[in-house]
């Protein structure tokens, strides 16, 4: 799940450790993808269990694990030694993986100067690189209404903004619009400063930073802008000149939200998604 790139930096921050988003990109580039699980692939957790389960995964990737004692009374290496792999198609050998790289890719560009995240393992080959026309929405609900009303077509790029840590506030998961697009058979990318569930499939790009509510370029996009998504080359680009973005920024105002209490305090204190959406000390 792309939430890994949100929660691990936040946990590390509590220990005084900085875990940069670039590290996820570096590790993914050299980590083979060995189990093609639903919703990205054809296999379910029942298939994985029948193929040997987590002990079989540990056996495949034994070199990653130290020999610590577990609550089972066996060490990790003892679990690996006692495991069986019953289906090589479900738990692939390291030298014959589903993909040679891992499931997460970090994108950059004039829409996401600080970065954005996509679960690249869940993107079909024909959607890894595309250019489309922006359909811009200032909330998940507005995007859902447009999708369910039949106003989104292939060739569009759905832009959902003001759903980030500050803008939501709280960075909700955009599972509903991506599920609707998939269920309607639409191969349409969705980009957002919100986040996604592990159940998301397709070209769903989230965690765009800086988010729209902080004045990020995502908030400057207009209907009709052309957007290029190039996952293999880590690019997310709007075909809008720098001068035009500066001109738009001069008249930009975030939508007002009637916040009070904890949500207002949270929105004022939370960092960007790329930093783990952590609460800054006052």
Task: State where each predicted segment sits.
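Catalytic or ion-coupling anion/metal-binding cores of large enzyme and transporter domains
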Residues: 1-211, 216-282
């Amino acid at each position: 799940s792309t939430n890994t790139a949100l929660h691990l930096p936040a946990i590390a921050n509590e220990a005084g450790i900085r875990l940069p988003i670039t590290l996820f990109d570096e590790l993914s580039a050299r980590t083979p993808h060995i189990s093609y699980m639903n919703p990205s692939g054809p296999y379910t957790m029942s298939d994985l269990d029948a193929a040997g389960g987590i002990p079989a995964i540990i056996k495949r990737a034994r070199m990653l694990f130290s020999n610590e004692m577990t609550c089972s009374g066996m060490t990790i290496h003892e679990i690996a030694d006692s495991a069986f792999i019953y289906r090589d198609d479900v738990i692939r050998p390291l030298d014959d993986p589903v993909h040679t790289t891992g499931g997460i890719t970090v994108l950059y560009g004039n829409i996401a100067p600080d970065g954005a995240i996509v679960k690249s393992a869940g993107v079909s080959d024909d959607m890894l690189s595309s250019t489309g026309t922006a359909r811009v929405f200032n909330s998940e609900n507005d995007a859902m209404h447009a999708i369910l009303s039949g106003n989104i077509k292939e060739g569009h790029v759905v832009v959902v903004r003001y759903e980030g840590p500050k803008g939501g506030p709280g960075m909700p998961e955009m599972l509903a619009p991506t599920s609707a697009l998939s269920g309607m058979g639409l191969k349409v990318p969705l980009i957002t400063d919100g986040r996604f569930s592990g159940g998301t499939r397709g070209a769903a790009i989230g965690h765009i930073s800086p988010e729209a509510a902080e004045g990020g370029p995502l908030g400057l996009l207009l209907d009709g802008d052309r957007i290029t998504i190039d996952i293999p080359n880590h690019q997310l680009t709007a075909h809008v000149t720098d001068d035009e973005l500066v001109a738009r920024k001069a008249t930009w105002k975030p939508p007002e939200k009637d916040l009070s209490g904890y949500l207002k305090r949270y929105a004022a204190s939370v960092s960007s998604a790329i930093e783990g959406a952590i609460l800054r000390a006052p």
